Amino acid sequence: LHTAYRRQRQMCIRDSYGAGGSGVRVMTSSSSPGVALKQEGITYCAGAEVPCVVLNIMRGGPGLGTLQPSQSDYYMSTKGGGNGDYRTPVFAPASVQEAVDMIIEAFDVADQYRTPVMVVADGMIGQMMEPVDFEKERKQRNLPAKDWASCGHQNKRKPNVINSLYLQSEELEKHNIKLEKKYKEIEENEVQYEMYKTEDADLVFVAY
């Protein structure tokens, strides 16, 4: 485990791009304005299919806002806050234990689909303390090998080049169709919810 602190939020997401592109598991975190500054880097990661985890401990806004808890970054997280029609899987923990569980799973989802994954908590969860279980049984995924990673080819294969630049419109269209298929697959396979006292309900409202 290696931890790095950068003076600028933009540097953090660019470090994540480089680390994720080399096949390393990487996470960057900040609160709402800091994550807003990372959006350019997140869309680069989405376009280049670089897996990483982005943790947002949400606080009130807009602007500098407040340090108090908030859930106001929903659209920025779920609809893609940077340029282009990209999407990211989003986990939204409701407790400290769920934050631990979902961050662990977020790394697996990022690797399985080669995508940045958002974890959105709020300032209340960010400041809470409770006993957590790191050893609980978790969903086991058959993760693909990272043969796409740019980690040094040692003259044994063609170098892997990872970027999000497609100068020919046909190439970009083909790439975006591929991404949209991936987002549809994530939508179909990765939805999570918890039912509570809904057995006899005629109508259920779902909100965040």
Predicted regions and their residues:
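Short acidic, glycine/serine/threonine-rich loops at helix termini
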Residues: 15-18, 38-42, 63-70, 101-104, ...
